[in-house]
């Protein structure tokens, strides 16, 4: 069977070149005589892998030296608890709720202190991003938390909060590595890797040095950022295969794509094709305010739920899989992450037009 176009929100597509390299090295990595999945995390081969992966991430994202990088088990959801456990030093934090995951992060933080929801776009079913310059932030907040791209509702920030003396913490799971990011605007960036980086099973956190070392003594060892970051992610056995795959994807981004500036141009061109089609007809609709439309996750609906269901079924038969929208919003969602080729978007639009003509 031919490979399909996978529009899943995550786990999602990986570059075919990366998959083929992993396939070629599956049984024996280099001269190790073993697979990366088998080797000791203390071996010289894996030591080189993890160091090279971090170094490549630092180059690709231009991460300053005063930030530490860590590879964590537990995914981004575990970070929802780690953030307040490590950073909520005043007992308070500000949260901007723009979708499901930022809401879950706020609820988790409320277990450990005051999680003040200072702005929300729930009033319009999360179809926009609040004006970050008009939000009444709390000066005694330990940090401000955002989810920079909203996978379920298909929105993204066009600018981020900048409050003097209050660090910004961002969940970038569904937009990381899709475009350049000024890391210096953030105290902490974290992301699950299964959307735009690697297979499921790991999160990466980028933390500014001055935010470390303030967790209470009763914070569990493995929930303390300092535990892993001061041991270069080797306090215990790390998610070795995910780290290896992350390294391959980063090298692909750096060498084949040419970096994040080029990746952004490619992604914006793909998204434009899909949004231009949606705006040019009336059968399919996208509810998001234009300024805040996500480049990564494009949501749309047909005239009724029955047609939505029919569309997803026929799309899957045609080789376009995982287009069903999240249960919270219904409809369809095309996640067009880095690895989705432009031809996949072009062919999806052709299929959408065919479906429209047959069902309008």
Give short role names for the model-derived ranges.
Residues 10, 109, 120-176:
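Active-site phosphate-binding strand-loop segment of PLP-dependent enzymes
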Residues 188, 193-275, 289, 358-360:
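Active-site C-terminal subdomain of aminotransferase-like
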Residues 77-144:
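PLP-dependent aminotransferase-like
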Residues 3-54:
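A glycine-/small-polar-enriched, mobile loop at the entrance of the PLP active site in fold-type I
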Residues 33-79, 86, 100, 108:
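Conserved N-terminal alpha-helix of the aminotransferase class I/II PLP-enzyme fold
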Residues 284-314:
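Conserved PLP-binding catalytic core of the aspartate aminotransferase-like
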Residues 2-4, 317, 326, 330-360:
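PLP-dependent enzyme catalytic core of the Aspartate aminotransferase-like
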């Amino acid at each position: 069977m031919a490979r399909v176009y996978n529009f899943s929100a995550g786990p999602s597509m990986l570059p075919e070149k990366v998959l083929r390299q992993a396939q070629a090295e599956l049984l024996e990595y280099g001269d190790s005589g073993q697979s990366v999945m088998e080797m000791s995390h203390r071996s010289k081969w894996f030591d080189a892998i993890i160091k090279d992966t971090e170094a490549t991430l630092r180059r690709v994202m231009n991460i300053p030296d005063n930030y530490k990088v860590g590879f964590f088990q537990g995914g981004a959801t575990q970070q929802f608890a780690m953030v307040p456990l490590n950073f909520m030093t005043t007992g308070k934090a500000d949260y901007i709720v723009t979708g499901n995951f930022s809401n879950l992060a706020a609820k988790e933080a409320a277990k450990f202190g005051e999680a003040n929801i200072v702005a929300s776009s729930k009033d319009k079913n999360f179809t926009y991003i609040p004006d970050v310059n008009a939000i009444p932030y709390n000066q005694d907040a330990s940090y401000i938390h955002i989810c920079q791209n909203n996978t379920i509702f298909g929105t993204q920030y066009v600018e981020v909060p900048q409050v003097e003396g209050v660090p910004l913490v961002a969940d970038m799971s569904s937009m990381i590595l899709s475009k350049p990011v000024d890391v210096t605007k953030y105290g902490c960036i974290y992301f699950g890797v299964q959307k735009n980086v690697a297979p499921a099973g790991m999160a990466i956190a980028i933390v500014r040095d001055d935010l470390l070392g303030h967790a209470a003594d009763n914070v569990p060892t493995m929930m303390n950022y300092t535990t892993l970051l001061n041991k270069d992610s080797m306090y215990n056995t790390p998610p070795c295969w995910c780290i290896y795959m992350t390294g391959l994807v980063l090298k692909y981004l750096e060498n084949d794509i040419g970096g994040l500036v080029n990746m952004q141009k490619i992604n914006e061109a793909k998204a434009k094709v899909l949004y231009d089609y949606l705006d040019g007809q009336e059968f399919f609709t996208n509810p998001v305010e234009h300024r805040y439309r996500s480049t990564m996750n494009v949501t749309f609906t047909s005239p009724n739920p029955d047609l939505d269901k029919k569309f997803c079924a026929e799309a899957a038969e045609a080789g376009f899989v995982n287009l069903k929208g999240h249960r919270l919003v219904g409809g369809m969602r095309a996640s067009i992450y880095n690895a989705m080729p432009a031809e996949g978007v072009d062919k999806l639009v052709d299929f959408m037009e065919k479906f429209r003509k047959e069902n309008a």
